Amino acid sequence: VLARTQRITRGIDYRSIVRRGSRRAGALHVVHVIDTGESRPPRFGFIVSKAVGNAVTRNTVRRRLKAICLEATPRLRPGADVVIRAFPASAEAAYADLRHDVVRGLERKAAA
């Protein structure tokens, strides 16, 4: 479970990261990253739209993304704000494929 300090909760933060952050698209998602320069753990936010599936499917995808990000946190820059937007294909993807795709995107954009 991501700690409260590792979550992006405000809508204005989501908007600024998506609009001004650098991004990298994978086959299953898009990673948006802004480096704030602060000395705190990276923060994560997730966008999983209704196009991904019903509520159960969306929450499953969100839980998978959270687990992947928690695992990748030690390899990321302190102060990075990361928003991951899931594509509909992520609902059908195997966990290993989703993990590979997300970790590759995070390492290219937010690695320490």
Where in this protein do the model-derived segments appear?
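Positively charged, solvent-exposed patches that mediate nucleic-acid binding
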Residues: 1-112
